[in-house]
């Protein structure tokens, strides 16, 4: 589902720049796209306490993520109609909705997998080869965490801080994106390993305006096993150490 959403985001973003000769391929592409659905969480809403409260998890998943899914599906259906009708003005207007809500769905689907209760390994440091790669590029795991926290705290307004793999440069990177932009909007060669939501809805009910405290505590429930699995999958043909 995540790959499907990313594809449709880029179809929408670049729709007006495509040559007319390619227009004939866009409608079948849109028709093949499936609507998004809210994924179930792999843990209970209170399983991440005290790092993240049950109240926040319920609101974040049931309200915020669900809204992105609903609005994305609505925009996707409208885009299909606009393309079928040749309504280029509406196609242009729908691009920002597709990007924002589709991106919100993509990011949150990753975010839930990036978290795990302590009793299920949340916060447990990663194993090799990811551990060695982190040491090589950031000096230590603590060095990576400090950089992530600093970059996340410095995001102006709303956005995300990412720990990712740059397959082109063959190295690990820390990046930030604004609003609900997925990491892939900075380049298809970037693979998200960990994404941390720094929108206020992710922490304000519990931490108020103390974003730095939220960033400090969230590492106790980070699912490093998931990050390590994604890293290994995408580095089988790379040497990044």
UniProtKB/Swiss-Prot annotation:
Gene3D superfamilies: Fe,Mn superoxide dismutase (SOD) domain, Iron/manganese superoxide dismutase, C-terminal domain
Positions of Mn(2+) binding: 60, 108, 197, 201
Annotated compartments: Mitochondrion matrix
GO terms of molecular function: metal ion binding; superoxide dismutase activity
A Pfam family per the record: Sod_Fe_C
One BP annotation, GO: floral organ abscission
GO cellular component, as recorded: mitochondrial matrix
Names of the cofactor(s): Mn(2+)
Catalytic activity: 2 superoxide + 2 H(+) = H2O2 + O2
The entry's keywords: Manganese, Metal-binding, Mitochondrion, Oxidoreductase, Transit peptide
Free-text cofactor note: Binds 1 Mn(2+) ion per subunit.
Record EC number: 1.15.1.1
Biological role: Destroys superoxide anion radicals which are normally produced within the cells and which are toxic to biological systems.
Family: Belongs to the iron/manganese superoxide dismutase family.
Subunit relationships: Homotetramer.
Name the UniProt record assigns to this protein: Superoxide dismutase [Mn] 2, mitochondrial
Name of encoding gene: MSD2
């Amino acid at each position: 589902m995540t790959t499907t959403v990313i594809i449709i985001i880029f179809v929408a973003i670049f729709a007006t720049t495509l040559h007319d000769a390619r227009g004939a391929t866009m409608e079948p592409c849109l028709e093949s796209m499936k609507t998004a659905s809210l994924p179930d969480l792999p843990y209970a809403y209170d399983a991440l306490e005290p790092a993240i409260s049950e109240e926040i998890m319920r609101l974040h998943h049931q309200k915020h993520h669900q809204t992105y899914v609903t609005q994305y599906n609505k925009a996707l259906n409208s885009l299909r109609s606009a393309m079928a009708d040749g309504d280029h003005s509406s196609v242009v207007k729908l691009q920002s909705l597709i990007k924002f809500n589709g991106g919100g769905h993509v990011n949150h689907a990753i975010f839930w997998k990036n978290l795990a209760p302590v009793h299920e390994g949340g916060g447990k440091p990663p194993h090799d080869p990811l551990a060695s790669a982190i040491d090589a590029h950031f000096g230590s795991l603590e060095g990576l965490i400090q950089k992530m926290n600093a970059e996340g705290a410095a995001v102006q307004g709303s956005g995300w801080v990412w720990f990712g793999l740059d397959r082109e440069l063959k190295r690990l990177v820390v990046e930030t994106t604004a609003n609900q932009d997925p990491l892939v909007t900075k380049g298809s060669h970037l693979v998200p390993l960990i994404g941390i939501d720094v929108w206020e809805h992710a922490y304000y009910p519990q931490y108020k305006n103390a974003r730095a405290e939220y960033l400090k505590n969230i590492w106790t429930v980070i699912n490093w096993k998931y990050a390590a699995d994604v890293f290994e999958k995408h580095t089988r043909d790379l040497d990044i150490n």
